[in-house]
C-alpha cells in the first residue's frame, strides 16, 4: 500500500494480521477515508453471555481442555541426570530422601510438542479475559504451573497481571537511564507477590483435601506477607490457616491481614528463623500442610511474574532484573520462569539477575563475596525496615546460588539509611514503594554508579509489596523519628497559623525555593 498523509477525517482500523496474535510482527493498518460524521467502529461478534444460573466455574466445565498429556512431578533440586527419585504432586512431601530441597519438574518433551510461537500466542490470548481460571496471571500459564489440576480445584483471586511501569523521572533524573522499569507485584490481592505462589499452593491443598489426604489446615511462618496471602486464599476456599509470626517484628498493616481473614495467629517471642524452625516441627507431627517456600509449589506461581515481564515487553528480554531477597525462593522462581521461556523457544536468552539484600540480613551477599567457595554460614539477622527479608538462615539458599550462577548474576546490599533514602527518593518521583523495593533500588544505584549497569540497559526492578503496608516506616522517616538516621529527604508537614498572611508567607517561601 502506498503511504501518504492522512486527513483528519481518516480512521485507522487494525487489519486482520494485527489481531491474529502473531508476536514480533509489525502492526499493519487499513486506512478508510470517512466523511465528517463520527466513525462507526467495525462490528465484532459478541461472545454469548452464559445463562443467569451458570457461573464461570460452570462455564469452564463445559470447555474442553486445550492441551492433553502434560504433567509435572517433584524431583530433588539440582539432582544429577542419573537420579530416578521423584514424587507425585499429590504426595505430601517437602524434601528428598537425602533431605535436599525439591523442585517441580515439568515434562519438557511434552511441552516441546508446541513451539515458542504457539506458547506466546496462547498466553497472549488469555490476557484481560475473565474465563476461569485464565483471568489470573498465574493460571493463564496453567500448562506450565500445575497442568493436571482440575479447574474446579483452583483457588484464585485473578492475581498476577501486575503493573510494569516505566520509572521515567527516577531513571532519567537520578540514574541517567532511559529504560528503567518497575514490576509492581505489590498491586495484588493481598498487596504482595506472595499471592502468586499461594494461589498455586492452596489450589493443590484444595485438591488434596478432596482426595481425602490427611490435611486439616495449612500453616506457615511469616514476616508478614506470606501470612496475609495464606490466610486470604485459605479463607476463600474454606480451609483453616495457622500462622506463626515473630512478636513485634512486623507492621500492623501486615498483622491485621491474617487476623481479618480468620487465621489462627500465634505471636511467638522469636525471629522468623525461630518461627520457621517451629512450624517445620509442628507440620511433621500434625496434619497441617506446610506453606513456606521450602514447599516448591509456591515457586511455580511466583515464576509467572518473570513470564509476565517478557510478555509485557512483547517477548523482548530485558538486560537486568533486580529482585529483593530474604528467604531466597523468589530469585530462583524468576530464574525458572525465564529459563522455561528460553528452553521452550519463546525467547533466545535470559536476563542477568541481581539479588538485593538488606545489610542487616545479608547471608547471601556475604556468601557471594566469598565467591560461593566457602560453606554457607547462616547468621542472626538484625532488625531492618525491610522486615519481610529479615532472614538470616534462608531456606532457598541453594536455589538462589544456582539461579545466580546460571544467570551470571550479582548480589548487592543496602544499609538501613541507603534503603530508606532510596525509598523516599522513589516516592518523591510518584512511586509509593515498600522498603524491600528500596533495597532493590539501592542495589541498582550502586551498580549504575560502578558502571556494571549501563545507561541504556533495559532494567526491571521487582517491587515485591505495596507501600501501604509500610506506612509507619515512611511516617517515622519524614518525621525524622529514626534514631541515628539523618533522613535527609524527609518532607515533614509545615505548621502554620490559620491566618491568610501566615499562609501566604509560607507559600511564597516554598515557591521561591522551587523556582530554580
Swiss-Prot record:
Binding site for S-adenosyl-L-methionine 2: 163-164
Binding positions for S-adenosyl-L-methionine 4 per the UniProt entry: 172
List of residues binding pyridoxal 5'-phosphate: 326-330, 464
GO molecular function, one term: threonine synthase activity
GO biological process, one term: threonine biosynthetic process
Binding site for S-adenosyl-L-methionine 3: 172, 178
Family annotation (CDD domains): Thr-synth_1 (cd01563)
Catalytic activity: O-phospho-L-homoserine + H2O = L-threonine + phosphate
Bias type Polar residues, positions: 1-37
Record family assignment: Belongs to the threonine synthase family.
Name the record gives this protein: Threonine synthase 2, chloroplastic
Organism annotation: Arabidopsis thaliana
Lineage: Eukaryota, Viridiplantae, Streptophyta, Embryophyta, Tracheophyta
